[in-house]
Amino acid sequence: KPFLYIYALEQGLAPSDISYIEPTAMHFNTDAVLQPESHKSRPGHPLNNAGAISSSGAIDQFEDFLAFMRRLTGNSKLSVLEDVYTSEMATNANNRAIAMRLVATGRFSTIEDGMRALDNYTRACAIGVTPAEITAACVVLARGGMIDGEQVISENHIVRAINAMNSYGLYERTGEISLLAAGVRALSCKSGV
């Protein structure tokens, strides 16, 4: 999710598309953050599923995002694990509901745009990476977006992503973890990486 957010910012995602970075005690995959009674029409955080699906709307061609991740990881053969993608698409009813809520609140203009963003998000979640590869991508962030002396990511976008991880990277346990392990920026995910 942080890499989706960074990529979206690099592609021109306006900060107002993710209205603010607000930690919440809600689960990462709830659509409650977009309910009419919350008076919010934009996801409040780029690291919950609503925010990540919203960020995925900035991916015009998924191959471009994959090329970005290949560059960061140093693996030119990085790919989507098609069996994981197919399984996720068959069982992601909650994320479909979130994408439709994003359409209903005006984040996406059409149902097709919302479903394309959902597809991009699901494909991104199914990219097969090793711990060494994700570490290499994180090293690029730690070096301020530099690879071999070339600025490949805006430092401002890295700061935004790190701040997002610091405020909600471990979802509803972020506050507890931040208190016990001050300064640790992390993101929990299903892969365990």
Report residues per predicted region.
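Structural beta-strand/beta-sheet cores of well-ordered domains, especially the beta-sheet scaffolds
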Residues: 98-100, 125-127, 161, 191
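Cytosolic covalent-transfer regions centered on His/Cys nucleophiles
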Residues: 119-121, 144, 156-159
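Active-site-adjacent helix/loop patches that line small-molecule binding or acyl-intermediate pockets
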Residues: 10-124, 140
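Electropositive phosphate-/nucleotide-binding environments in soluble metabolic enzymes
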Residues: 49, 92, 128-131, 155
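Active-site SXXK
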Residues: 1-14, 137
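Active-site-proximal alpha-helical segments within enzyme catalytic domains
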Residues: 2, 128-146, 193
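Conserved SxxK-family serine transpeptidase/carboxypeptidase catalytic domain
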Residues: 148-193
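A conserved catalytic-loop motif detector
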Residues: 112-113, 130, 136-139, 148-160
